[in-house]
């Protein structure tokens, strides 16, 4: 008998989550040393006691032994769960040999569910909406402890941002919570386990500092954030439940018994920066020994008006620290710190100088030509009031003082510091890299330095722009553009555990949908973006992202949840169509052009906007057709898709020559990517595309849409040699052109106009996984239950190693070449199969073989490598 065991259990894609308001969905991974083994049945038991759950006593719910191989997102189907309750669960799985494996007990805790809040929304009486120098209010409440504490949970929503402290210690490393939403539709509360923060005896104090965030953004910008329908002064709602050893419970609620005071954060704006006057500090303000003389009573205030839901997405945190690689003093007496990497985050400042001195920190990704200042002009134009990416600190003493901003983040590589002494007695600046704290679960490495450089650019741009929402850039806009997210969500799911992050943003999209089915081009939106930029090309993400999440998990409940919203959006597109053609989108944004960013005239795009818009309209119909079949619903969309396809071909593809309107890389790639032609015609079109690229000197000639179309279709047709030649061009336009000009992240425009930290061209990373390593889904089979291994062994890459974390375990593909021999290694997770597809130059009888779960190693002869 082999070794068969359960190795990981998750609930709603988390291990032991706190605070679930949605139905629990269970998942588990298994291992077996028997190649090709699989699960044949499972049983889930849920109990309020861990030992009972593991003993198979599911006094809350027992699924019973259920035949099947399902181990991803199995829904809880027991009686209604109680709010604020910990439940333990175990799963027993049986394999083909009849062996049973029992998991260790795991747990989940419910959130508030439908329980009414006992707490009231409160604010500080000194906060006024007409002020534009808004600082951060501090709120506190001291309370007795009646005995030995068994457990304590804090349920909290502080708008715009909150940081909570108990007896002087912050309760979490989380930052900028809650995540940005359309607050008058939906806000998130977070649940913290604060048991260890409470003292053993005596009184305790809970303190909360509130930032403005996106909720009270008073800065004028191009997207009308100051006029947001939800905008109001910062406010707090929280309940601290304390359970004692004797089983009794206290609830400390936000109410008028709280005290409030201004503090050292005299200004904070997510669009401008943060100002901190250390002379105004309140030492010990969140401790019981503090005398709150002069503090004012909190006031009751109306809430944000939307639904309150427990946050499941990973929080934003500091994930890495970067020390300066260079520091120097300018001719004007300022200091320049180069952190060596463009990123999103903030700094930890060690401030030197006399008491009362002000240190001004300005952030940006570039320096002026003479290196004397940070260059902010190219990205600051949309922020119309206040200073751009500027923090200020006023010292309280003559000694060194350490400070980190609380309620902002910036996009930068360089920091310009004004007000520091001529000589620095010690380290001064440390970069703190911030992003949504998902794990990096995918890995791609190879011996080719160019590909690894591009992969690093994609990584740093990606994490810079995952800040509770998928932003376009971390400095100029911080906006969640739909088109950018639609282009990059595949690589995010391959590189990171980004499911919850993307699911949260999908909910944002649905909350922003208007009754007519339209969605904005940026989301969350203040109302901007419904009348421009929200064509099918950008809004297509409402269709593609649910399918991508379904493809990742195999959970049809995802499709069921978003299906009505997708249908309404399809109806909106149909209302905008004229004779089957739609033409109200942005088009192939940022294809190579001359001039500064945000000056692109859409009429100059080679690929007609009506072509790309209508192709996306067609794809939405096709995907709705597939979703309807998965959900067992009537399918009117297949016939609709054929009508759209006929209209597109009539208008944009020459029936005699097969030439596509625009005669460019994006046009050809668009028609092929959306499979608008018959297979033989599509193959000829791909030959024409490869020829077109060669005639263009292997140069890139596409924008955001074409980046996905061209590279993926070349990969589908086995033309990774063409992709390789495009990616390794060192001149304009191309990735290496950016690198040659000092970029450490992806730029917005091929000519380096505009932002230098945009992630919209990062789908190339997904191409590395899918077409270089060759790990990709096999048809429409979801959750990698069956997948392809189609490594590009004919490329001139000596070594390659790639892994993808599937719901069943780690998929691995890698090779090492030695002369005309290649050793290929594959890892296939338990309960899955992989179909091997090899390039023509590989002499292998295993080509086309189906590999079962386990580790596989092959040694083959290989022809001369391409590329």
What feature does the model see in each segment?
Residues 104-109, 155, 205-208, 362, ...:
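Beta-strand segments within the central parallel beta-sheet cores of soluble alpha/beta enzyme folds
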Residues 2-86, 90-476, 483-484, 500-503, ...:
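Extracellular/oxidizing-compartment recognition motifs
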Residues 162, 171-173, 178, 509, ...:
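Active/binding-pocket-proximal capping segment
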Residues 206, 276-277, 477, 495, ...:
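C-terminal capping/lid segments that line or modulate ligand- or cofactor-binding pockets
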Residues 161, 255-262, 424-457, 463, ...:
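Active-site acid/base region of carbohydrate-active enzymes
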């Amino acid at each position: 008998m082999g070794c068969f065991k359960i190795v990981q259990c998750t609930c709603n894609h988390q291990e032991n989550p706190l605070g679930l308001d949605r139905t629990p969905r269970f998942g588990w991974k298994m291992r077996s040393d028997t190649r090709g083994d699989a699960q044949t049945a499972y049983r889930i038991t849920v109990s309020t006691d861990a030992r009972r759950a593991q003993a198979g006593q599911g006094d809350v719910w027992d699924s019973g032994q259920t035949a099947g191989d399902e181990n991803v997102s199995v829904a809880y189907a027991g009686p209604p769960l109680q709010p604020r309750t910990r439940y333990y669960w175990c799963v027993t799985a049986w394999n083909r040999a009849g062996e049973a494996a029992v998991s260790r007990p795991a747990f989940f805790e419910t959130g508030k569910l439908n329980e009414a809040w006992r707490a009231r929304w409160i604010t500080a009486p000194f906060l006024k909406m007409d002020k534009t120098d808004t600082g951060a209010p501090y709120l506190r409440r001291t309370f007795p402890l009646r005995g030995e504490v068994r457990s304590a949970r804090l349920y909290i929503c502080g708008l715009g941002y909150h940081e909570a402290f108990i007896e002087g210690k912050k309760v979490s490393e989380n930052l900028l919570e809650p995540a940005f939403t359309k607050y008058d539709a939906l806000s998130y509360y977070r649940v913290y386990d604060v048991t260890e923060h409470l003292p053993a005896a005596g009184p305790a104090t809970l303190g909360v500092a509130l930032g403005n965030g996106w909720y009270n953004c008073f800065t004028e910008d191009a997207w009308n954030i100051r006029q947001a329908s939800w905008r109001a002064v910062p406010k707090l709602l929280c309940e601290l439940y304390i359970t004692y050893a004797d089983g009794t419970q206290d609830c400390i609620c936000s109410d008028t018994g709280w005290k409030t005071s201004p503090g050292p954060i005299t200004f904070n704006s997510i669009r401008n920066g943060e100002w901190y006057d250390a002379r105004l500090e309140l030492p010990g303000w969140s401790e019981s020994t503090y005398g709150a003389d002069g503090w004012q009573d909190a006031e009751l205030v109306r809430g944000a008006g939307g639904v309150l839901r427990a946050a499941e997405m990973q929080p934003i945190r500091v994930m890495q620290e970067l020390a300066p690689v260079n520091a120097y003093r300018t001719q004007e007496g300022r200091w320049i710190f180069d952190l060596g990497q463009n990123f999103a985050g903030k700094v930890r400042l060690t401030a030197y100088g006399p008491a009362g001195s002000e240190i001004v920190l300005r952030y940006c990704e570039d320096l002026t030509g003479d290196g004397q200042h940070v260059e902010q002009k190219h990205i600051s134009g949309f922020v119309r009031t206040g200073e751009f990416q500027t923090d200020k600190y006023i010292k309280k003493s003559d000694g060194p003082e350490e400070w980190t901003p609380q309620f902002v983040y910036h996009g930068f590589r360089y920091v310009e510091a004004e007000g520091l002494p001529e000589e620095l007695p010690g380290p001064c600046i440390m970069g703190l890299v911030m992003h949504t704290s998902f794990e990096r679960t995918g890995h791609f490495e190879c011996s080719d330095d160019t590909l690894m450089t591009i992969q690093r650019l994609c990584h740093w741009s990606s994490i810079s722009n995952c800040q509770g929402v998928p932003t376009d850039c971390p400095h100029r806009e911080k906006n969640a553009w739909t088109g950018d997210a639609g282009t990059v969500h595949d690589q995010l799911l391959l590189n990171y555990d980004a499911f919850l992050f993307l699911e949260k943003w999908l909910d944002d999209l649905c909350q922003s949908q208007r009754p007519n089915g339209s969605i904005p081009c940026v989301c969350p939106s203040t109302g901007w973006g419904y009348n421009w930029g929200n064509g099918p090309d950008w809004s297509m993400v409402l269709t593609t992202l649910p399918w991508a999440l379904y493809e990742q998990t195999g959970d049809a409940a995802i499709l069921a949840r978003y299906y009505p919203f997708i249908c309404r959006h399809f109806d909106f597109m149909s209302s905008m169509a004229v004779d089957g053609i739609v033409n109200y989108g942005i088009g192939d944004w940022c294809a190579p052009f001359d001039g500064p960013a945000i000056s692109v005239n859409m009429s100059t795009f080679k690929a007609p906007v009506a072509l790309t818009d209508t192709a996306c309209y067609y794809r939405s119909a096709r995907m709705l057709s597939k979703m309807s079949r998965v959900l067992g619903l009537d399918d009117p969309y297949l016939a609709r898709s054929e009508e759209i396809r006929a209209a597109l071909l009539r208008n944009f593809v020459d029936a005699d020559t097969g030439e596509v309107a625009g005669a460019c890389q994006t046009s050809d790639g668009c028609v092929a990517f959306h499979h608008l032609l018959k297979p033989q015609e599509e193959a000829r079109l791909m030959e024409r595309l490869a020829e077109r690229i060669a005639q263009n000197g292997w140069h890139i000639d596409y924008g955001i849409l074409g980046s996905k179309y061209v590279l993926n279709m070349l990969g589908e047709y086995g033309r990774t040699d063409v992709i390789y030649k495009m990616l390794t061009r060192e001149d304009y336009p191309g990735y290496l052109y950016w690198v040659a000009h000092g970029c450490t992240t992806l730029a917005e425009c091929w000519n380096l106009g505009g932002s230098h930290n945009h992630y919209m061209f990062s789908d190339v990373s997904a191409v590395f996984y899918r077409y270089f390593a060759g790990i990709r889904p096999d048809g429409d089979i979801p959750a990698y239950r069956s997948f392809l291994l189609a490594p590009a062994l004919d490329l001139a890459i000596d070594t390659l190693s790639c892994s993808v974390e599937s719901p069943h375990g780690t998929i691995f593909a890698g090779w090492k070449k030695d002369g005309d021999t290649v050793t290929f290694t594959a890892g296939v997770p338990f309960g899955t199969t992989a179909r091997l597809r090899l390039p023509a130059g590989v002499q292998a009888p295993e080509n086309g073989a189906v590999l079962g779960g386990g580790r596989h190693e092959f040694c083959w002869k290989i022809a001369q490598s391409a590329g």
